[in-house]
């Protein structure tokens, strides 16, 4: 793959997450009954950062959990019978809560749909919203993000790579040609 452009550097990633944090607070008229669920792998550290920014703004902790959508993906053809079903790593209650699913990139919307399915299998929240760092278009399902860091229209021959300090050692969003 050939690097085409650096779309967001560390400062831009942080500014974007701070803005999304403010939008979440404003849209929900505060943070009562909010739960942030990050989609593994990069959605979870993003959820933790947004929770940290919200705490800095509101002075209150927001519960954070993760959702593993592996068993809910419709593009996997074979799943081992020995595989442990562990879709939500919460340690918290989601019934009647306002859930915000957080992911790094929204592309076809299949990951978001799988996360919604995983959440609904556990319990019925009051509502579900979606926050993404990057929306690159190419939706295959009628799902849209409620909070978008940056809209990046791409071709099918381009790849968006999100790097996060917690996983990759740096914060950046880059676009590559395949």
From Swiss-Prot:
Sequence motif PRPP-binding, location on chain: 99-111
Name this protein carries in UniProt: Bifunctional protein PyrR
GO molecular function: RNA binding; uracil phosphoribosyltransferase activity
GO biological process: DNA-templated transcription termination
Keyword annotations of the record: Glycosyltransferase, RNA-binding, Transcription, Transcription regulation, Transcription termination, Transferase
Complex formation: Homodimer and homohexamer; in equilibrium.
HAMAP family recorded: PyrR (MF_01219)
Gene field: pyrR
